[in-house]
Amino acid sequence: MADTSECQSDKTVKEEPFQSVKTRKRRKNDKEEEMDTVESRARPSFPPVKAQKLAGGKSETRKIPVPSHRYTPLKENWMKIFTPVVEHLKLQIRFNLGSRHVEIRASKETSDIGAVQKAADFVQAFILGFEVEDALALIRLDDLFLESFEIADVKPLKGDHLSRAIGRVAGKGGKTKFTIENVTKTRIVLAETKIHILGSFQNIKIARTAICNLILGSPPSKVYGNMRAVASRSAERF
């Protein structure tokens, strides 16, 4: 009888399967994997919110006044302005003949929140006197800005003194202006006593300093030297 009981106990020992004991780290990893799979299944997908919905259902608008001397250039280049605003930014644009304003409005297809402001900056740059190709950079790039100031803001000049200051900034045949543009990678418009600069923040700062020095009476050669030194330093920094 004792032998039979021993045999039965041996059988039960042999029949019991071997159970692998998991370490704490492994158990934790398994739990994390299970949680990830559950989260991925239950994770909702939210489509991007339309710009019109963010504005509370109202379509955002901008109105840019057009001075009389820019009517003809606007008419000649209208398709170059119209195409990127409508096709690329998905906005609505028109020229109001009654109020003499370019009106820009968001549509149902507009997805970018800042599209209306980009288009307004683009049109404003053209109205100020920049070429359409240069102004288009305001739509394509995010880190470009427009800055405007008057010569009187730098130094109160009148008569011939003012004319000479404008001449120093422009240079013979526009040479000085082109040099500043090429070195600082900006675009400059001289509109009577107003100066408009288009470019990145750092480059506008360098160009503005050079123009201010010319207005204050510094010789062009000295201004070129200082400007190139500052531009090379900023290029090395970035």
Curated annotation (Swiss-Prot):
GO cellular component, one term: small-subunit processome
Biased composition, class Basic and acidic residues, residue ranges: 8-17
Residue ranges of domain KH in the record: 159-211
Assigned keywords, A-Z: Nucleus, RNA-binding
Superkingdom of this protein's organism: Eukaryota
Principal subcellular localization: nucleus
InterPro entries: KH-I_PNO1_first, KH_dom, KH_dom_type_1_sf, KH_PNO1_2nd
Region feature (Disordered): 1-65
Role according to the record: Part of the small subunit (SSU) processome, first precursor of the small eukaryotic ribosomal subunit. During the assembly of the SSU processome in the nucleolus, many ribosome biogenesis factors, an RNA chaperone and ribosomal proteins associate with the nascent pre-rRNA and work in concert to generate RNA folding, modifications, rearrangements and cleavage as well as targeted degradation of pre-ribosomal RNA by the RNA exosome. Positively regulates dimethylation of two adjacent adenosines in the loop of a conserved hairpin near the 3'-end of 18S rRNA.
Family: Belongs to the PNO1 family.
Subunit-level organization: Part of the small subunit (SSU) processome, composed of more than 70 proteins and the RNA chaperone small nucleolar RNA (snoRNA) U3.
Protein name (database record): RNA-binding protein pno1
Organism field: Nematostella vectensis (Starlet sea anemone)
Gene for this chain: pno1
